[in-house]
């Protein structure tokens, strides 16, 4: 299978996915979250991990709150604030800080690859907590997706790789563990949302979670605020990640959980590395090799199986 063929297969699979009732949200969310690694890297270098995370959720909260008010959803937000606070800590507060710390040592592409372990955590938690037992085809999809991610990770960390985890080519263990902790928190938040916030408007969950995370991070971020004023580029990056990757993206994410379930919603992270690698090539000059395209096709096939788009066994 040559690179052009795999690229065509990936494009066709994504196009088919978009035609699903929730497929458009699935691909859109992957594209938005794929850009978050690039934007967080730019902002974290100057703001620091914790202030960047606080700014991200704070900007998202400021963006979302007027929408809640204009849509007459403030009573719902007030009623469910405790539950959305928990979601905010699990789905934004802890993960954003962990990823910010990791991005100081590993590349954006490598961190996005690690982020693709979320569906594995999500399927396990949904199975144990929500009794959402995956079918054989969906289990195969998780395995195929994991293989695609492993292929990318092997090439990224191996000798002569274009995506180095650090200047020495070795990813610090704490950075890897931080990313995995973030993935575990994402998975827990998705199942918590499905169990306790089903039927709640996605805008309410998105706004409440970002406000909760903002409250949790505000004080430590103020203590660790940089003494030197960050550049305009860093400010634009943190505003972009707040509005696009948190404000708008979480509306799409919670709507996807409602329509497709937490396990399928979390499978979006199989596509995130594909977009992250694309953005890295365009904006950071990282090479996109035929091997990356082959891995992308494997990941997309895994996504199609794990979300039920393709079914091998009933």
Residue positions per predicted region:
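Glycine-/small-residue-enriched transmembrane alpha-helix faces in small-molecule transporters
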Residues: 2-54, 101, 160-195, 314
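Hydrophobic/aromatic residues within transmembrane alpha-helices
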Residues: 43, 52, 56, 102, ...
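Hydrophobic transmembrane alpha-helices of multi-pass small-molecule transport proteins
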Residues: 64, 125, 134-159, 163, ...
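Specific transmembrane alpha-helical segments of multi-pass solute transporters/efflux pumps
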Residues: 31-40, 65-115, 151, 242-260
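Helix-helix packing/entry segments at the starts of transmembrane helices
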Residues: 53-55, 92, 96, 109-117, ...
């Amino acid at each position: 299978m040559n690179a052009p063929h795999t690229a065509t297969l990936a494009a066709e699979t994504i196009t088919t996915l978009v035609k699903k009732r929730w497929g458009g949200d699935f691909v859109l969310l992957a594209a938005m979250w794929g850009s978050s690694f690039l934007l967080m890297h730019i902002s974290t270098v100057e703001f620091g991990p914790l202030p960047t995370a606080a700014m991200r959720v704070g900007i998202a909260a400021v963006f979302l709150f007027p929408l809640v008010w204009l849509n007459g959803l403030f009573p719902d937000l007030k009623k469910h604030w405790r539950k959305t606070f928990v979601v905010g800590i699990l789905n934004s507060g802890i993960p954003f800080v962990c990823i910010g710390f990791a991005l100081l040592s590993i590349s954006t592409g490598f961190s996005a690859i690690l982020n693709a372990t979320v569906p594995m955590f999500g399927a396990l938690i949904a199975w144990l907590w929500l009794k959402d037992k995956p079918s054989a085809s969906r289990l195969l999809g998780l395995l195929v997706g994991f293989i695609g991610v492993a292929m990318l990770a092997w090439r990224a960390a191996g000798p002569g790789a274009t995506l180095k985890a650090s200047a020495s080519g070795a990813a610090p263990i704490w950075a890897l563990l931080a990313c995995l902790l973030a993935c575990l928190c994402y998975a827990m938040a998705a199942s918590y949302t499905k169990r306790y916030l089903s039927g709640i408007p996605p805008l309410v969950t998105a706004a409440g979670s970002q406000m909760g995370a903002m409250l949790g991070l505000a004080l430590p971020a103020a203590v660790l605020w940089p003494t030197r004023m960050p550049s305009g580029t860093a400010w634009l990056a943190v505003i972009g990640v707040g509005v696009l990757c948190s404000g708008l993206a979480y509306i799409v994410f919670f709507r996807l959980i409602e329509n497709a379930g937490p396990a399928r919603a979390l499978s979006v992270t199989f596509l995130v590395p594909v977009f992250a690698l694309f953005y890295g090539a365009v904006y950071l000059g990282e090479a996109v090799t035929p091997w990356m395209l082959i891995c992308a096709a494997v990941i997309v096939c895994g996504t199609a199986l794990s979300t039920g788009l393709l079914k091998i066994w009933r």
